[in-house]
């Protein structure tokens, strides 16, 4: 099981305010075929102990295309919402990504295309995201230290973002003032 501590801040919208603060996130990947797995996520707010997120996602990988596709269910708990009401507000998730390596001589520099669609229980779309990222991985920057830099652009929100990952630490910053930090335990 993969476990991480996540801290988010800087949001100005009410729904982002409810997701700020320290959260404990757990993820389990269960292989079900050679190129497929079932991925379960769960998250609780560290201060209240209340669940903030639960998800179950079927992911299929296409190695020859450097792509993957995921389909699943997610529940976001907001403002200590009682459990039966939260289950009434679950959403469907469809996500896809494709990696492009423009310089075959340097496989550590690449372009990622990502898309995600969320739909309510009646299959009405509620949120869409699409992004393009330039990703650069630097192995052994210092002994035992791997670094990954990502510069991305959210196409639908017309907003750039940045990610810096160093071994167990990840820092994300968005041009609208939001940020988050993750530490993988």
Swiss-Prot record:
Transmembrane segments: 30-39, 64-73, 89-98, 106-115, 129-138, 146-155, 161-170, 177-185
Membrane topology classification: Multi-pass membrane protein
GO cellular component terms, A-Z: chloroplast outer membrane; etioplast membrane; pore complex
Region described as Disordered: 1-22
Chief location of this protein within or outside the cell: plastid
A GO molecular-function annotation: voltage-gated monoatomic anion channel activity
UniProt entry tagged with the keyword Ribosomal protein: no
Coiled coil (UniProt feature): none
Gene Ontology biological process terms, A to Z: regulation of monoatomic anion transport
Alphabetic keyword roster: Chloroplast, Ion transport, Membrane, Plastid, Plastid outer membrane, Porin, Transmembrane, Transmembrane beta strand, Transport
Localization per record: Plastid, Etioplast membrane; Plastid, Chloroplast outer membrane
UniProt function note: Voltage-dependent rectifying anion channel that facilitates the translocation between chloroplast and cytoplasm of phosphorylated carbohydrates such as triosephosphate, 3-phosphoglycerate and inorganic phosphate (Pi) depending of ATP to triosephosphate ratio in the plastidial intermembrane space; in high triosephosphate/ATP conditions (e.g. photosynthesis), export of triosphosphate from chloroplast (outward rectifying channels), but in high ATP/triosephosphate conditions (e.g. dark phase), import of phosphosolutes (inward rectifying channels).
Family: Belongs to the plastid outer envelope porin OEP21 (TC 1.B.29) family.
Descriptive protein name: Outer envelope pore protein 21, chloroplastic
